[in-house]
């Protein structure tokens, strides 16, 4: 399709007709993307960008097998799921086969938000309880029911935490309440959940569910310590609640060895409800809730029929089947393991070289780089992170920054990401970090101790901009600056190199 408008015309029309809260990546200088293929995106000038952040185009942008499956089915039939059709049952059968046996009943929706909203309904109907335990910094969707259980959202806005919502500390062993030097961080964090349950019961409240991403994404690429989920599930089920695993961002083989991220934590841990979305349709809007027969029967016993007009329609199911085929036929799980390990190795070498890198954490092709101003206090390097993602864009590499302090570089590329891509990305990052550290006077020798503060002496100009950014932090709307959505005001304040 030919372009209808110039980049500036497109931007002007967007500002006029699209809600101002709907942000674009790199808002101060957005990229106009006109096509994409595999792990590469192309702007209106034909410039190629390496996509390191798009976990929606899971098997690669515009994968020919996925496109062909959608086109073929659209030529035959697309209608709602009240009609009997093979695609939905075939997809449900194959999807269930990737999960533990007890997770066998599917409800198809169109987005992760719809899936998580339905999961809450299932949980509340199961025992008749209402309260929900969520993790600090969590994000589970944009519906009102999910904003209420997403501290990532309601803590940044004017909303007040609802009485039925209980927030447990995120199991972050790098900068959380219990860190890597704790004798048993898994038990310590799980005991925080138990305290919440006990306090709720003492107040006459009952827990319906504990919900968590198997690995927190918006929370800063957090991987819970081994054993944490098992203990939490024990406490929650003992209170009559269910465990909801949100796999919307981290499922479908992204971690490599396992198809679902929750499977990393052992065969003795099986959630009661699993939600999935983003990568499921490789850009086609589809999502799902999978649960046990017992929970599904309790939901049906309410007498209220569940119907979703587009959920599980023939075209969506055909797309979903094609995505499963590509993951298997192209060994994308194996690729996630191999390339993820290689990328992590390269990044750990950078960690010994650059004092701005405080922590590298991740599994497969889900990796976070926690940037810090000093290693002893682990002070988040927020402005530096924003500076880096813009500089990476100039090098034609797309990254974003997130986490509660927006200082964690997020890496979650399409699953066809290669070792050559990983090497190129790290080379660009190395050059930018080197330039930034030279400009700020930071040492970059590999012999620096992890526990030694980086006593950086920044140029007056850069230092004043960082101070100004810090002073405005509490006054500016944080929602305008997350996910790499750097606003004009923030861009004007980023470090100059």
Curated annotation (Swiss-Prot):
Lineage runs: Eukaryota, Metazoa, Chordata, Craniata, Vertebrata
Q: Per the record's keyword annotation, is Cell division included, yes or no? A: no
- Can you name this protein? Ethanolamine-phosphate phospho-lyase
Task: Report the EC code(s) recorded for this entry.
Answer: 4.2.3.2
Tell me the domain of life: Eukaryota
Task: Note down the stretches annotated as region Disordered.
Answer: 440-497
Q: What does this protein do?
A: Catalyzes the pyridoxal-phosphate-dependent breakdown of phosphoethanolamine, converting it to ammonia, inorganic phosphate and acetaldehyde.
Primary place of residence?
Answer: mitochondrion
What organism is this sequence from? Bos taurus
User: What does this protein need as cofactor?
Assistant: pyridoxal 5'-phosphate
Classification via PROSITE patterns: AA_TRANSFER_CLASS_3
């Amino acid at each position: 399709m030919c372009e209808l408008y110039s980049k500036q015309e497109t931007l002007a029309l967007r500002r006029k007709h699209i809600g101002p809260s709907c942000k674009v990546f790199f808002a101060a200088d957005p990229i106009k993307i006109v096509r994409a293929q595999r792990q590469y995106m192309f702007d209106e000038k034909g410039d190629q960008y390496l996509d390191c952040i798009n976990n929606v185009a899971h098997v690669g942008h515009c994968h020919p097998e996925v496109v062909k499956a959608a086109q073929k089915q659209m030529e035959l039939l697309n209608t709602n799921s009240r009609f009997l059709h093979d695609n939905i049952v075939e997809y449900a059968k194959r999807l269930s086969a990737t999960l533990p046996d007890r997770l066998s009943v599917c409800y198809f929706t169109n987005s992760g938000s719809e899936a998580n909203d339905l999961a809450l309904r299932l949980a509340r109907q199961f025992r008749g309880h209402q309260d929900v335990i969520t993790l600090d910094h969590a994000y589970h969707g944009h519906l009102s029911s999910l904003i209420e259980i997403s501290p990532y959202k309601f803590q940044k806005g004017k909303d007040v935490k609802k009485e039925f919502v209980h927030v447990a500390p995120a199991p972050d062993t790098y900068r959380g309440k219990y860190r890597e030097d704790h004798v048993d961080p898994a038990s310590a964090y799980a005991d925080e959940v138990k305290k919440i349950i006990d306090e709720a019961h003492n107040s006459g409240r009952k827990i319906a569910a504990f919900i968590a991403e198997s690995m927190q994404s918006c929370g800063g690429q957090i991987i819970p310590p081994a054993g944490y989920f098992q203990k939490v599930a024990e406490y929650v089920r003992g209170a009559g609640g269910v465990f909801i695993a949100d796999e919307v961002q981290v499922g479908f083989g992204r971690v490599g060895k396992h198809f679902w991220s929750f499977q990393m934590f052992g065969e003795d841990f099986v959630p009661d409800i699993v939600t999935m979305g983003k990568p499921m349709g490789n850009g086609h809007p589809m999502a799902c809730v999978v649960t046990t027969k017992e929970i599904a029967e309790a939901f049906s016993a309410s007498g209220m029929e569940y119907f979703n007009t587009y959920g599980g329609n023939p075209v969506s199911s055909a797309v979903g089947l094609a995505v499963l085929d590509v993951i298997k036929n192209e060994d994308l799980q194996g690729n996630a393991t191999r390339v993820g390990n290689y990328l992590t190795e390269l990044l750990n070498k950078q960690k010994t070289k650059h004092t701005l890198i405080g922590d590298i954490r991740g599994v497969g092709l889900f990796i976070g780089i926690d940037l810090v101003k000093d290693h002893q206090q682990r002070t988040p390097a927020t402005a530096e992170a924003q500076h880096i993602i813009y500089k990476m864009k100039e090098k034609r590499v797309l990254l974003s920054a997130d986490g509660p302090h927006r200082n964690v570089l997020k890496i979650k590329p399409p699953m066809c990401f290669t070792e050559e891509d990983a090497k190129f990305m790290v080379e660009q990052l190395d050059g930018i970090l080197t330039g930034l550290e030279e400009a700020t006077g930071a040492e970059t020798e590999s012999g620096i101790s992890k526990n030694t503060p980086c006593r950086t002496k920044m140029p007056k100009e850069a230092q004043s901009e960082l101070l100004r950014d810090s002073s405005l932090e509490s006054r500016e709307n944080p929602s305008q600056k997350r996910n790499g959505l750097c606003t004009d005001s923030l861009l004007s304040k980023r470090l100059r190199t």
